[in-house]
């Protein structure tokens, strides 16, 4: 899977492409699921200007086995940090370092990240919008979640007022570079002014969008508005002895 990320601040506008690849797993998934090839191309026009939720709704309008599907997503944070999903008018208790959840395609989900290493008291509130689904073998959904990594660099950049957009995509095996993957994420920089969603679409199939920075709870804003209505989240225990997918990413 891949992610696309962009930074923007008062004096900084940058777009990156970041990636992590599980070559054998991605090829197996694509070969065993012909529908994936039929989904291309997408052509995301003016995607960067769309408000949160619009891209997921647009994807649902294209049809396919998406509506009502609960897609596993694993959010990963630096060691010691805690991640909590929104629920009701607040947040559930945070889980350390990794949170495995099931999200519907289309809604926007707000999360809270706390206890960031070296940043006592800092809280950040990223959102995740799932725009497509994976097609793993039957009974293997939880072994192959969409991975969303929150790096310390990104968290600190968001805390400084920069806005980060990352698009996680399923890499096209015909474009993949067969490298031995390390635990750290591999990043490819896109040109300034490029839309990370469009870049991700050229390299594979966009799966989810992470947005972070620039939003904290406002006293004049209702809790439900800030939480985008707090759509229900399915929380999973992580499977034992799981082989995680490595996926390329655009940031």
Where are these regions (language model features)?
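Bacterial N-terminal signal peptides
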Residues: 16-32
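Short, intrinsically disordered, low-complexity terminal/loop segments
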Residues: 2, 250-251
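Sec/Tat signal peptide C-region and signal peptidase I cleavage site
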Residues: 33-37
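N-terminal secretory signal peptides that target proteins for export/translocation
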Residues: 1-18
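A general "mature secreted/periplasmic domain" signal
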Residues: 38-250
């Amino acid at each position: 899977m891949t992610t696309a990320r962009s930074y923007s601040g008062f004096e900084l506008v940058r777009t990156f492409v970041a990636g992590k690849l599980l070559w054998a797993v991605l090829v197996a998934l694509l070969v065993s699921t012909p529908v994936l090839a039929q989904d291309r191309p997408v052509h995301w026009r003016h995607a960067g200007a769309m408000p949160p939720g619009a891209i997921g709704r647009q994807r649902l309008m294209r049809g396919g086995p998406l509506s009502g599907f609960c897609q596993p997503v694993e959010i990963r944070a630096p060691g010691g940090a805690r991640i909590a999903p929104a629920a009701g008018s607040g947040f559930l208790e945070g889980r350390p370092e990794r949170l495995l959840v099931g999200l519907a395609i289309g809604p926007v989900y707000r999360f809270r990240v706390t206890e960031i290493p070296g940043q006592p008291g800092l809280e950040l509130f990223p959102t995740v919008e799932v725009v497509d689904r994976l097609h793993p073998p039957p009974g293997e959904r939880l072994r192959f979640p969409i991975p969303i990594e929150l790096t310390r660099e990104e968290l600190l950049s968001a805390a400084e007022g920069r806005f980060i957009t990352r698009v996680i995509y399923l890499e096209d095996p015909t474009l993949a570079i067969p490298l031995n993957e390390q635990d750290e994420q591999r990043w490819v920089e896109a040109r300034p002014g490029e839309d990370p969603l469009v870049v991700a679409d050229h390299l594979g199939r966009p799966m989810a969008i992470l947005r972070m920075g620039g939003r904290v709870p406002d006293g004049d804003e209702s809790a439900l508005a800030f939480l985008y209505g707090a759509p229900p989240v399915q929380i999973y225990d992580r499977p034992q002895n799981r082989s995680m997918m490595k996926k390329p990413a655009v940031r």
